[in-house]
């Protein structure tokens, strides 16, 4: 990350005016600005003979970027002239931590305005090295089509160059990758009970530590536990809390799909308000799950761990970077990763990554990290999207658009907004209202949910709020 210049730039001053108060030193806005100065990041801007930049700030590169790491803003107040003499002014922000060096931005620019720097080529070599590593979870496993868990595992384990031991709690990931006598794991793997993945790994780590002290082992081994939300938020919370409090050298990764998916879609304490599950059915007496989900990430922060982070598989650079940091720390660390489940969420098999991205852009699942008690936001949506855009893509929330249930979607939106504002304060970030003011050219439109009602109609019953769906009927969803 480039250092911030000592002298405030025009962009600094303008951003401060837009926000209405000084910018906090470690805020997302300051880090955002660091890439706006030509020559200090991955790209420079090509200059014309007149001395002006070739870039017209048209936004084509921003639209083409598959990982949304580019932000283009045209400053009309400083754009002047006509025809060939026209000079464009604005800012281009490129998040070098998120960039995957796909070259789409340069290929789509018809003015060849973006010129890669040596830093870009260095970053590209680093990305290609990670991409060329052999996946540690082999193909041929039994995970459902579109499951997010396998993606999470391979992204986390891609950051390990040494030997490792994985402890896997009973759940979707375990039963689908370790069907006796076969295994999809290329490293050492221990299948534990539902509730004791962290406890088992604690014993393994302690045994290795004893062997190190006796001089019987020299090579350092990494210890990683994987558990779903059922085995982490609920059944395995006691073992997890104990392992974290005792300070074992291990990384615990929770792949959160929002319910007990392996055993038939029962609700867990990670299930969102209003979601359909087989134990929180939709009907006249109960419109889905009652109550909001537990904030496990904050519970882990309360354990005063050296590193806690929340991530998502749609942003591999973010997840892999956090896994790398967590594995390098001497002590217990925790990652909470969203893991879309097409079967349980009643979504399309090819929509997992898009749903993960929407969860982040609606701020239902923000990306942040806490290092030794210091909060830091690692991604902030350019324009925060309405939660309904995420809800309507999932059949488990389809009933929220029916008469009498609209208030649940509103309650969930209010809850997400409050949690997001609280996180912004913890991260010393600019409030959402002032962030929107800085993006004044974006006009938020009222959002109305349009779920995939044809799936409900296919059940052969009228669309009413009093409908109750059995597990069998929803299996046909």
What is each model feature region?
Residues 126-252, 265-275, 289, 302:
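Cofactor-binding active-site loop characterized by glycine-rich and histidine/acidic residues
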Residues 2-4, 319-477:
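Glycine/aspartate-rich loop-and-adjacent alpha/beta segment that forms the canonical ThDP
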């Amino acid at each position: 990350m480039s250092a911030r210049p000592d002298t405030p730039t025009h962009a600094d001053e303008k951003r401060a005016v837009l926000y209405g108060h000084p910018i906090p030193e470690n805020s997302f806005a300051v880090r955002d600005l660091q890439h706006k100065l030509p020559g200090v990041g991955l790209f420079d801007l090509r200059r014309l003979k007149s001395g002006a930049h070739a870039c017209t700030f048209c936004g084509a590169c921003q639209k083409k970027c598959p990982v949304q790491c580019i932000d283009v803003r045209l400053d009309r107040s400083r754009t002047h002239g006509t025809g060939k003499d026209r000079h464009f002014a604005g800012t281009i922000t490129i998040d070098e931590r998120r960039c995957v060096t796909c070259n789409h931005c340069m290929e789509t620019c018809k003015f060849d305005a973006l010129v890669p720097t040596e830093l870009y080529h260095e970053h590209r070599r680093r990305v290609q090295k990670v991409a060329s590593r052999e996946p540690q979870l082999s193909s041929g496993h039994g995970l459902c089509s579109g499951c997010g868990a396998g993606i999470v595992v391979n992204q986390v384990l891609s950051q390990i160059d040494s030997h490792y031991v994985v402890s896997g709690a009973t759940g979707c990931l375990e039963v689908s990758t370790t069907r006796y006598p076969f295994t999809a794991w290329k490293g050492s793997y221990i299948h534990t009970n539902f509730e004791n993945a962290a406890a088992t790994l604690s014993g393994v780590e302690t045994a290795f530590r004893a062997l190190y002290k006796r001089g019987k082992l020299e090579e350092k081994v990494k210890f990683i536990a994987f558990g779903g939300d059922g085995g982490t938020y609920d059944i395995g919370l006691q073992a997890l809390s104990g392992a974290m409090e005792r300070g074992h050298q291990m990384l615990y990764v929770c792949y959160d799909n929002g319910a007990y998916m392996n055993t038939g879609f029962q609700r867990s304490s990670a299930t969102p308000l209003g979601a359909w599950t087989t134990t929180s059915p939709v009907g006249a007496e109960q419109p889905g799950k009652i109550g909001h989900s537990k904030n496990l990430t904050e519970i882990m922060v309360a354990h005063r761990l050296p590193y806690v982070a929340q991530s998502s598989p749609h942003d591999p650079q973010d997840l892999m970077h956090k896994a790398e940091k967590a594995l390098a720390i001497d002590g217990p660390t925790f990652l909470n990763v969203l893991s879309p489940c097409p079967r349980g969420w009643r979504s399309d098999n090819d929509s997992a990554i898009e749903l993960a991205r929407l969860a982040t852009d609606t701020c239902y699942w923000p990306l942040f990290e806490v290092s030794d008690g210091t909060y830091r936001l690692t991604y902030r949506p350019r324009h925060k999207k309405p939660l309904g855009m995420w809800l309507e893509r999932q059949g488990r929330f389809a009933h929220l658009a029916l008469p009498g249930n609209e208030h649940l979607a509103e309650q969930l939106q209010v809850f997400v907004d409050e949690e997001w504002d609280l996180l912004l304060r913890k991260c010393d970030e600019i409030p959402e209202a002032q962030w929107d003011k800085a993006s004044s050219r974006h006009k938020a439109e009222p959002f109305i949910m349009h779920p995939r009602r044809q799936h409900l109609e296919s059940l052969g019953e009228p669309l009413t709020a009093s409908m109750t769906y059995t597990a069998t009927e929803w299996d046909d969803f």
